[in-house]
Amino acid sequence: MQSDSRQAHWEGVYTKKGENEVSWFQENPAPSLELIAHVGATPASAIIDVGGGASRLVDNLVDRGFEDVTVLDLSVAVLAAAKARLGSRAAQVQWIVADATVWEPVKAYDVWHDRAAFHFLTEECDRAAYVARLDRAIKVGGYIIIATFALDGPERCSGLPVVRYDPARLGEILGNSFQLIDTRHHTHATPWGSDQSFQFSVFRRMSGGRS
């Protein structure tokens, strides 16, 4: 899918549906928060939530005193909703409207978090473009936390096909500069009560990249 088409799709989703009317909504992003703590992130760590949308991860990070938080999403509408929810706290966050496959990072991050964005990239060229941006944006010693549908997870979401992953396949895509350090399976309950199987994979950058 081309970047313009991808953006149009998600603008349509977020202008028609409320925050808790999408399957990936979480009142409490506990798995992500646990892994961010697990990798040793501190309030001074630079964290980017890629495809963050209206996720409440940003609220929790700000409330915990994190001072360098960025949320990237290609939907203007969903970031506006997130800012409105945060109120005055929104000023403590860097907001980027961009497609992660064409965005050009201007700084380096300690933690790259992506829950339920990467698995929508079904074409190899888009995955390669995403990884190229990630490669330029993560410090040596930094961490990548990616949550995708697991191998037994859904094959489609929000009207689009997805790619399901296990940690080994993600490692192949990321390349030898990244070392797998943790994996966790998570069963997510959608707002309407169905279960979705997610795979959280955590990688550390061992070489290359920014310092």
Name the predicted role of every residue range.
Residues H113:
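A conserved beta-strand element that flanks and buttresses the S-adenosyl-L-methionine
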Residues M1-K107, L121-A137, G142-S211:
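Class I (Rossmann-like) S-adenosyl-L-methionine-dependent methyltransferase catalytic domain
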Residues A116-F120:
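Short catalytic micro-motifs in class I SAM-dependent methyltransferases
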